[in-house]
Structure formats: structure tokens, C-alpha cells
Swiss-Prot record:
EC numbers for this chain: 3.2.1.4
Name of the protein this chain belongs to: Endoglucanase gh5
Lineage: Eukaryota, Fungi, Dikarya, Basidiomycota, Agaricomycotina
GO molecular function: cellulase activity
Reactions it catalyzes: Endohydrolysis of (1->4)-beta-D-glucosidic linkages in cellulose, lichenin and cereal beta-D-glucans
Active site: 6
Coiled-coil region: none
Recorded family membership: Belongs to the glycosyl hydrolase 5 (cellulase A) family.
Native source species: Fomes meliae
Keywords: Carbohydrate metabolism, Cellulose degradation, Glycosidase, Hydrolase, Polysaccharide degradation
Length: 27
């Protein structure tokens, strides 16, 4: 979860794309 929170500080577009990959990795 800490990684996801840090990702929120990035750009919106990049954040969403990175978040999607991160969530997929978590699952």
C-alpha cells in the first residue's frame, strides 16, 4: 500500500497507468 500512496504523487496519467500495473501486481 505504501508504494501505491507514493505513486499518487506522480502525474495523473502516469499515476493511473502505473497504479493499474501496481494493482495487477498486488493481485
Amino acid at each position: 500500500q505504501a508504494v501505491l500512496s507514493e505513486t499518487g504523487g506522480g502525474d495523473t496519467a502516469s499515476c493511473d497507468e502505473y497504479l493499474y500495473q501496481e494493482l495487477a501486481y498486488v493481485k
